[in-house]
Every structure is written in C-alpha cells, then in structure tokens.
Amino acid sequence: MAPYNAFVRGANTFIMTSQERHEARFQRRKAKRLERKQARCNSLGPMNKVFSYRKMFFYGKKCCNGVRWKQSVQNFEGHLFSGTATRRRTVLEQTWKPKSCSHFTLRERGKIRPIDAPHITDRQIHKTLCNEVLIPLYSPSMIYDNGASQKGKGLHWQFKRIKQQLGWHYRRYGREGAVLLLDLKGFFPNASHALLYQRHRELILNPELQNLADTVIQYSPCPTPGRGMPLGVEPSQQEMVALPSKIDQWIKCQARVHCAGHYMDDYYAFFPTVDEAKLMGHEIVRRFEAAGIRVNKRKCKVIPLTKPFRFCKARFTLTETGKIKVNGSRDGVKRARRKLKLFHREFKEGKRSFFDIEQYMECQSAYYRNFNDHGRLLRLRRLYHAIFFGGAKCIGSSKTEPTLA
C-alpha cells in the first residue's frame, strides 16, 4: 500500500512533500473560487440580457421617484419609451459616455461635502449597472457586518449589530477588554482607480460589462487624476462599500476577530484585552496602507469597555449589569434648541410657517426616539411648548394654536 502522501496513477507512484501537498490544496481551492466567480458572472447573462429594455425601463421609472417636481425629470419621464431604446443602443454598442455632473456643496454638521449629481439619463444606466451587475458580484465577497449602502441594512441596523456583538462579548469576558476604533482618511477623495480596475478584472469576468464599469470610473469627476470617487453617484457608493473587502475578510477569517464590523469608512472591533486591541490595530493599519487605503491615525483609538465610546455619532455604554445604552448625538440637542428659538423669531415676523416648525420638531423627535434619550427628548419638547404655547400642557400640537407672545 502506498504511504499517505503518495498518489498511485497506473504503474507509477508519485511521492509528494508537505509543501507540494499544501500547494496542491491551494490550487484546488483557487480553481473552485474561480469556478464560483465564473458561475456568478454566467448567471447574469450576456450584455443584451443584463441591459434589456424591460430592466432599463423599470430602473428609469425608479430614478423618477421623489424628484418628479424637477423639470428635467418630467422631460425624462415623458420621453422614457424612446429614450430608453436610444440609451440601450449606445450601451450595447459600447459608445455610451457619461455626461458631466452637476457640482454643488453641502454643509453637514459643520463639514463641507462636495456632491456631484449625475444627469438623470446617466442615473438610469447607473442604477441598472448597480442592481444587475455590481451588487450580485460584490455581495458574496463582503462580510455580513458591513452595513452601509445595502438593501435591508443601514445605520440603525449597524447600531443593533454592535449591541448584539457587545452582548456576545459581555457573556464571555464581562467588561474586560477594549474596543478598537479606526477611521479611513478621505475615503472617497483618496480612492485609487487602480484598485477599482483590479477588482473589476477579478470579479467582472464579462469583458463588455467590465468595460462599462471601467467607463463609469474613468469619466468620474475627480480633482486628482487616477484618484477619487464622487459623492452622489450610485456606482461610486457600491464600489467604495466593497473596496476594503479583502481586509475585512482577513480581519474576520484569518485574524479570527469575531466582533468586528464597519459602516463605510468607520471601523470597530472588540477584543478581550487592551494589548490585543493595540497589536491588532497596528496590523490593520499596516495592511490598509499597504493596500493603498489611507488611515486617519489621529482618529484611531483603543477605549476600555468600562468607558463609553462613540461610533457614527452614537454613544455606547456597557454597564456593570450588561445593559447596553445607546445615546444619540448630544450636539444635535444644542442645535435643535438654537433653531427652535430662531424659528420662533421668524414665526413672529411671518417669515416661517408653523407647519414647517412642526415638521422640524417631528424630525428631531423621530431621531431621538431610536435611542435611550427619553430625557433629552422630554426637555426638548418642554422648550418647544414653552416657546410656542407659553408653557401650555403638552398636548397634540395640531389641536393647539401657537402664541405669538
């Protein structure tokens, strides 16, 4: 009988070393992964099936939802039958080129964000590409705890997931250990186009679909040649949410960090000891920088679980009994109080309707109802009723007329 590391083929016996057996297993795994990738690409079908008239018309209708008040959207929807056929022909002939985006800036919580809004005709192609190509091919390589820009997930889903992982950690280690927080620097502006093209070659095996995905990146507005993805473009969101997937897989599978995840460019991970968190933090930062993804080292922190920590503007506290408290942004209450006083002055001057003020108050209430912030919400509503109703009892605002005093 041949030894355990020997293969008998006919009259010949091949003796393999340990290194050769490891290499053979690696090649078999690699071949199976490539076979699965090819099967996923084949399941999409050819170019004319992916960009069929029916699918493009369906996603063209979805592009109009919520923005039908715009004149450009009304013109687009009015000529959707003929326009879809024209745009489909350019895509199949590989002559489609995106139009220039409308550039504007937003100030979000004091931070200026440049936004590039694509033309609605390009949004139809972007939405078809994302839903029919990028999402089916990118999702299998993404970890479950990546909660940004995915159907069925979101920011509050990520908060619930953190609470579940904190509970898992508490049942095994109590309040011992620490949380590692990392932030990627200029995630969208510093994205390397070479990394995105490489992902297309690895995951999009259809040459026509790969060329279309490359075209979207090639014509994306970016201040630095070969670097940067715009905010406000749907393929840009899908590309960036899946960009760090290799490092995510290393953290979860090879480093075996059970409680870890991220929301776009904000990372967190729970460890049994502070030293382990620091050691793993240095290794993760090294791997990000080796991959060409910048890390904001100023925002990288290791916080003991006996202290509260902040993630995506929310404050998490693990108590001694194991209860997990989640509080919303404290700065939001300060802004809301200032705005209510400003709105009252504008309301007395006739510059703002009371309906707008009610809508703003409902938005603030809806935000803080998602957290353990009953006290903050109660104090904010007391201020609201004291300003607009002269300290009247807290009853339905729609049944009570505001005072001008």
Model features per residue range: what roles?
Residues R87-K111, E208-P221:
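Reverse-transcriptase-like RNA-dependent polymerase core
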Residues S43-P46, C130-P189:
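Active-site-proximal segment of RNA-dependent polymerases
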Residues Q165-M264, Y268-E283, R287, I303, ...:
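Conserved polymerase palm-domain catalytic core
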Residues C101, G261-D265, K297-R298:
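Short Gly/Ser/Thr- and Asp/Glu-enriched loop/turn motifs at secondary-structure junctions
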Residues I112-I143, P225-K252:
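Conserved pre-motif C helix in the palm subdomain of viral-like polymerases
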Residues M1-A31, P118, R123, K127, ...:
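Right-hand nucleic-acid polymerase module
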Residues M1-A85, E401-A405:
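Non-catalytic, polymerase-adjacent accessory regions of viral genome-replication enzymes
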